[in-house]
């Protein structure tokens, strides 16, 4: 009987908040980071198009179990809309499908912003990862098919005009999961009667991570010059953020080492005392600052749903 294969790479865990450069795909970025860190597992918390730059949170090791909590968080983008053309991809990459010589006044742009704030119905771009009949919309679009993509509700918490010129307007948006900034540019262009597409897009925030957490890819690649393997990996690991930081919006409990052992074995622990936390469907437990488990608090117990190895 053959022995099970050991996973390749180091069993490290944590978040690397990459400042993704332009013309670099999200999957390509994850592969590069996994290779640099010699990690067993890696995954990202939300695709960033090759023509977009900025924050791409990448989870290594056990941190991949916390990816859904980051994907569901608020995001902030800075973007520029070029007026006068609507394009097939709703950004610079596509072909022009509609054009207009009209250009919007700044007052008209500002007057339009409330329409796109709050819970809105939005149709994703034809070139998107939305599945239609089991196939990705972008695959169908590349084959020349025009498909009906149903509108979806998304939430925009804030939409601000930063500045404008005759052919361009610069915005900042804070939005929830599933919001397509390309669709926003397309729809605003139609409403203003001039058409529009994304000329530049940069993500600056994915809750709970901020701009101060971002690391340029060039800084990480530069560490390849360190010949000593252990020294190079230690320098890379210094950029990692603790796995538990992704859960900072959830209720938290601190446990001792004995309780941590029970939780990691999949067993519940009893929460006693006047300061015992209130029931909640999701909370996370740490021991000595290290993430132990995600679980629910019910009937005076913390019941683990996902456990994390000793980090």
UniProtKB/Swiss-Prot annotation:
It comes from the Bacteria. It is an enzyme of class 5 (isomerase). Gene3D superfamilies: Pseudouridine synthase (3.30.2350.10). Keywords: Isomerase, tRNA processing. GO terms for biological process: mRNA pseudouridine synthesis; tRNA pseudouridine synthesis. SUPFAM superfamilies: Pseudouridine synthase (SSF55120), PUA domain-like (SSF88697). It catalyses: uridine(55) in tRNA = pseudouridine(55) in tRNA. GO terms for molecular function: RNA binding; tRNA pseudouridine(55) synthase activity. The active site is at residue 49. CDD domains: PseudoU_synth_EcTruB. InterPro entries: PsdUridine_synth_cat_dom_sf, PsdUridine_synth_N, PUA-like_sf, tRNA_psdUridine_synth_TruB, TruB_C. Its EC number is 5.4.99.25. Pfam families: TruB_C_2, TruB_N. Responsible for synthesis of pseudouridine from uracil-55 in the psi GC loop of transfer RNAs. Belongs to the pseudouridine synthase TruB family. Type 1 subfamily. NCBIfam families: TruB. This is tRNA pseudouridine synthase B. It comes from Rhizobium meliloti (strain 1021) (Ensifer meliloti). The lineage of its organism: Bacteria, Pseudomonadati, Pseudomonadota, Alphaproteobacteria, Hyphomicrobiales. The gene is truB.
